[in-house]
């Protein structure tokens, strides 16, 4: 059954940074015609979900639709807004994507910076090996923003538009967005203090063909069809639109963004970061060449972030 055909009350949970699994809940929430649908954006996986916070909301949902108790004020969308360093709060919203969302671009610059201003003069090629190195060694290339002048909250769909090439017939493009503090230390966004990014996504370059019907301004959609398979030529420079899965996090005043563009899920210079290696499921890793990110006035390169109105929710009660 497709989401468009479901007209029953539905209570859904979506993960923020557990790669693919949460995507179904976001898409189902958007497509379901019923008004009686509820979405909860939780942390990195499902395991913290059976908590005091979640249990209370599930009981409220069941009370409303099984027992007819109408006095319960259950928010339509609940968001675990991660603050970093084991902190978060729950944000109540009426819809997803959030009303008032602004999709702002941070551009890749030739000096390795991330800026709200596009590169208009210089060109640069950032090359990196397609094989991840040992612990402590940078994987891929990083771009850094200037310190934020005020607190900013992100919630929703991210995406990255990049211009790339490779010495290989294909390239895995893994995009990870971090925050770093005034001491250049990675902010851990995992609820238990583990190093987790703000958001991440990935794309295999040969699958870059977009579905013009299903793509939305805030979220690219790729066809992944055999007839659209497009390997890279030796001198091909192509533009890729990388879907970065929805997430929610606050970046404090004085912190900076760090955007990693890498050939693999890992980032050895972030100690303790152990992401699930999705490419292993396919057995098609490309580890014997060089990838290049192209930056310049005629080379598209930016990350789009969902900036939402700053708001304080209610205290977390999760265990």
Regions found by a protein language model. Give the residues of each.
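Short beta-strand/loop motif that positions the catalytic acidic residue
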Residues: 6, 12-14
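Acidic beta-to-alpha connecting loop that harbors the catalytic carboxylate
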Residues: 16-18, 44-45, 264
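Amphipathic alpha-helical segments in well-structured domains
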Residues: 25, 54-59
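Active-site-proximal helices and loops of the catalytic beta/alpha 8
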Residues: 40, 52-55
């Amino acid at each position: 059954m497709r989401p468009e055909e479901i007209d029953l009350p539905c209570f859904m949970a979506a993960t923020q940074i557990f790669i693919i699994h949460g995507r179904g809940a976001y898409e189902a929430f958007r497509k379901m015609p019923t008004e009686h649908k509820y979405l909860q954006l939780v942390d990195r996986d499902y395991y913290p979900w059976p908590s005091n916070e979640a249990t209370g909301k599930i009981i409220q949902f069941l009370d409303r639709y099984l027992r007819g108790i109408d006095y319960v004020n259950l928010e339509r969308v609940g968001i675990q807004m991660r603050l970093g360093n084991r902190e978060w709060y729950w944000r109540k919203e009426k819809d997803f994507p959030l009303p008032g969302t602004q999709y702002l671009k941070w551009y890749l610059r030739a000096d390795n910076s991330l800026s709200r201003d596009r590169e208009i003069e210089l060109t640069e090629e950032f090359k990196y090996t397609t094989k991840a190195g040992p612990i402590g060694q940078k994987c891929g290339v990083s771009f850094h923003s200037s310190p934020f002048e005020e607190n900013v909250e992100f919630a929703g769909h991210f995406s990255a538009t990049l211009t790339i090439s490779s010495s290989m017939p294909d390239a895995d493009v893994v995009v990870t967005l971090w925050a770093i503090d005034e001491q250049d230390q990675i902010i851990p966004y995992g609820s238990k203090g583990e190093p987790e990014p703000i958001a991440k996504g990935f794309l295999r370059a040969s699958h870059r063909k977009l579905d013009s019907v299903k793509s939305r301004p805030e979220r690219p959609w790729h066809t992944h069809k055999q007839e659209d398979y497009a390997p890279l030529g030796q001198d091909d420079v192509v533009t890729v639109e990388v879907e970065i899965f929805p997430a929610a996090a606050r970046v404090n005043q004085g912190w900076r963004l760090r955007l990693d563009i890498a050939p693999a899920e890992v980032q050895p210079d972030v100690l303790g970061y152990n992401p699930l290696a999705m490419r292993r499921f396919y057995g098609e890793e490309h580890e014997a060449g060089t990838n290049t990110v192209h930056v310049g006035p005629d080379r598209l390169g930016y990350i789009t972030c969902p900036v939402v109105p700053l708001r304080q929710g209610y205290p977390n009660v999760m265990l």
